[in-house]
Amino acid sequence: MNDIWWQTYGEGNCHLVLLHGWGLNAEVWHCIREELGSHFTLHLVDLPGYGRSSGFGAMTLEEMTAQVAKNAPDQAIWLGWSLGGLVASQMALTHPERVQALVTVASSPCFSAREGWPGIKPEILGGFQQQLSDDFQRTVERFLALQTLGTETARQDARTLKSVVLAQPMPDVEVLNGGLEILKTVDLREALKNVNMPFLRLYGYLDGLVPRKIAPLLDTLWPHSTSQIMAKAAHAPFISHPAAFCQALMTLKSSL
């Protein structure tokens, strides 16, 4: 039986689960771990098939969420970045009693562009899937570079993301393809109308993967949720703007 890698950090009286994005692992939170650890008990996890949670194949969103839920705290704020935002959202849908609040970071309920909905063109996601089998390492690096484009610290931020990937075992191509398939096909826009826990959505103004145009659309679709756009951030605001990012979480915590 394979186990998912978890680590608990910090001694705060509020539990916070942090879920990373596609191709990465829990080391991505290293730059904010100290700051958040004095206010929260952090639960860091490598998603199934990523980092130290090896031995898993490609999964659907539902399967991935079920695996993560097995060893998760009874109640916590669930924060998911990018692909991790879909896992956190699915957790809020399937186990609402365990989700004190939901936070999505540079994430979308529907990453793929649809009619009347801004997103990544499906053919671009399909292209990434094709390139993975051709040149695995280069495709992952290209995807990481896209995440920091436009920020004042873009090169440095991209190096940070690359070091996170290289710090742990690389996911299998099958797992990465499965993650891209989730990004290409999942649409939780309607389902998330029904969540009623506090729900904060954080975006980067310069994000090239999750367009800021979705923020007002979701403000209308999900009036119970709150959105915040970080002015000079791209797809990884916790790396480029750690202080503002942590402050947004402290504000949420104080409102619970």
From Swiss-Prot:
Record has Cytoplasm as a keyword: yes
Enzyme Commission code(s) on record: 3.1.1.85
Binding site for substrate: W22, S82, L83, F143, L144, A145, L146, Q147, H235
Catalytic reaction annotation: 6-carboxyhexanoyl-[ACP] methyl ester + H2O = 6-carboxyhexanoyl-[ACP] + methanol + H(+)
Keywords, ordered alphabetically: Biotin biosynthesis, Cytoplasm, Hydrolase, Serine esterase
Domain of life: Bacteria
Active site positions: S82 (nucleophile), D207, H235
GO biological process, one term: biotin biosynthetic process
Chain segments annotated as transmembrane: none
Gene Ontology molecular functions: pimelyl-[acyl-carrier protein] methyl ester esterase activity
Gene Ontology, cellular component aspect: cytoplasm
Pfam families documented for this protein: Abhydrolase_1
Occurrences of domain AB hydrolase-1 (ranges): 15-242
Cellular localisation: Cytoplasm
Pathway noted in the entry: Cofactor biosynthesis; biotin biosynthesis
Keyword Hydrolase among record annotations: yes
Subunit structure: Monomer.
Annotated function: The physiological role of BioH is to remove the methyl group introduced by BioC when the pimeloyl moiety is complete. It allows to synthesize pimeloyl-ACP via the fatty acid synthetic pathway through the hydrolysis of the ester bonds of pimeloyl-ACP esters.
Homology family: Belongs to the AB hydrolase superfamily. Carboxylesterase BioH family.
PANTHER family tied to this protein: HYDROLASE ALPHA/BETA FOLD FAMILY (PTHR43194), PIMELOYL-[ACYL-CARRIER PROTEIN] METHYL ESTER ESTERASE (PTHR43194:SF5)
Name this protein carries in UniProt: Pimeloyl-[acyl-carrier protein] methyl ester esterase
Organism expressing this protein natively: Salmonella paratyphi A (strain AKU_12601)
